[in-house]
Each structure stands twice: as C-alpha cells, then as structure tokens.
Amino acid sequence: MANELNSLDIQEILSLLPHRYPMLLVDRVIDFTPGKSLHAIKNVTINEPIFTGHFPNQPIFPGVLILEAMAQATGLLGFKTVENRSENELYLFAAVDNARFKKPVLPGDTMHLHVEFLKERRNLWKFAAEAKVDGKLVCSAEIMCARREF
C-alpha cells in the first residue's frame, strides 16, 4: 500500500516513554519517519488536573506543558530512530530555544505536535517543533534532548 503511515497507539507510547498520568502528554502518534519527523496528537480536556489552578474560571493549557508535549514527541522520534536501543535509555529535555506562543490552547482542543530531527552531536539531539490547533500555529521552538542511559 502506498503512503502507509507509521503510527503508535497509547500502549506503544507507554512502552517507549517513562511518563505516566498526569505527565504523559502524547495520546497518539499519527505518523513518523525514523530519523526525520513525527506527527502526534494531545487531546486537551477539561479534566486535566492543571486546570484546577490554571486558571479556575478561564482554563488555559500552560505553555510549559505545550513545550513538554513537544519534547515528549521528540523523545518518541528518538526512540523510533535508534536501532538496538538500551532498555535503560532516556531522552532528557536539555534545552529550548526560540520558543514562541501564538495562541492559547483550551479545553476541547486537539494539539497536533510536529517535530523534525535537525542534527545529533555527542548524544545531543536537536529538533524543530511546532504545536497546532485547527491548523493554526500555537507554539514553535527548537528543542534539544540528551540521550542518556541510567
């Protein structure tokens, strides 16, 4: 079949990322190309624990959690890129540059996370990342992850 997508369901995501509720911020991977790019989604619901305090009468998904969701997507791309990875391997959020927040993310939104691998040097991986809602850019950043064994 031409143009078949490489996708990951929640069970596959749980097998790759160490994050768990309430910090697992990727619900599904729609498509990925190892060593190149990944497209994932995060469904934002009013049931997110953060909305009890951010903000009680005007819930807005925090920008730092948008960045974390994009970082988790980069970790998934890293794990799917490296062959023969160690069971004790993690991708740690190492840096964020040029972060820009364009629109708020609200309960009911589906964030589409797009990450693109840029380069790797000495186990530091650099990615371009974007989050979109309804096709509109809500956040963009360059993210660096450190590949480490524990």
Curated annotation (Swiss-Prot):
Pfam families: FabA. It comes from the Bacteria. Its main location: cytoplasm. The active site is at H54. The keyword Lyase applies. One of its GO terms (molecular function) is (3R)-hydroxyacyl-[acyl-carrier-protein] dehydratase activity. Keywords: Cytoplasm, Lipid A biosynthesis, Lipid biosynthesis, Lipid metabolism, Lyase. It catalyses: a (3R)-hydroxyacyl-[ACP] = a (2E)-enoyl-[ACP] + H2O. InterPro entries: FabA_FabZ, FabZ, HotDog_dom_sf. Its EC number is 4.2.1.59. GO terms for biological process: fatty acid biosynthetic process; lipid A biosynthetic process. One of its GO terms (cellular component) is membrane. It is found in: Cytoplasm. Involved in unsaturated fatty acids biosynthesis. Catalyzes the dehydration of short chain beta-hydroxyacyl-ACPs and long chain saturated and unsaturated beta-hydroxyacyl-ACPs. Belongs to the thioester dehydratase family. FabZ subfamily. HAMAP family: FabZ (MF_00406). This is 3-hydroxyacyl-[acyl-carrier-protein] dehydratase FabZ.
